[in-house]
Amino acid sequence: GLSPLGKAAVPALEEAGILLDVSHLNDAGFRDVLEAARKPFVASHSNARAVCPHLRNLEDWQIREMVRRRCLIGLNFSNGFLRNDGEKADFSHILRHTEHFLTLEAGDCLALGSDFDGTSLPPCLDSCEKMLDLGAALAAAFGRETAENILWRNAQAFFRANLP
């Protein structure tokens, strides 16, 4: 969880207009943020633990709470966050996580988080140029409007509403 200083920092950060990111927190730290936060926050690169049991992926109760608070959840493209068998992920794994988020009513909270900073990426997303392919896969699976919401609209709306 958060230290006493960390708990005290949450409202100070919010007051300063700094968005909190819970992607690297354990479950106890997440609960501490829920207790201290008064504004929406982000999980900049997190997937669904129900689909892949990585400890930094979000539990369903965390997703529901983020939906309730109108937070933003960025899909993580890292292999280990998409599947747990050591094999390379593909678009089907990203779509499974997306579908799970959508079943939890997170359609307005979901965005792209990526994690392009040196992690192990699946071949289907090992460069920014392949975002067009991801957009096509999302549109084919969930429709163009949902795909566009995930690709840019949700993030744009969140940042417009929550940044000074």
Residue map of PLM features:
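Histidine/acidic-residue-rich catalytic or RNA/ligand-binding cores of hydrolases
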Residues: 31-37, 53-58, 83-96, 116-132, ...
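Histidine/acidic residue-rich metal-binding segments in metalloenzymes
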Residues: 1-42, 55-70, 92-110
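Short acidic/histidine-rich active-site segments
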Residues: 77, 105-126
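Mid-to-C-terminal alpha-helical segments outside catalytic/metal-binding sites
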Residues: 126-164
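Conserved, mostly hydrophobic/aromatic
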Residues: 20, 45, 73, 115, ...
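Short helix/strand-bridging catalytic loops that position acidic/His residues to coordinate divalent metals
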Residues: 1, 47-52
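Active-site beta-loop-alpha junctions enriched in small/polar residues
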Residues: 18, 23-30, 46-49, 78-80, ...
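A conserved active-site cap/scaffold subdomain adjacent to cofactor or substrate pockets
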Residues: 71-82, 86
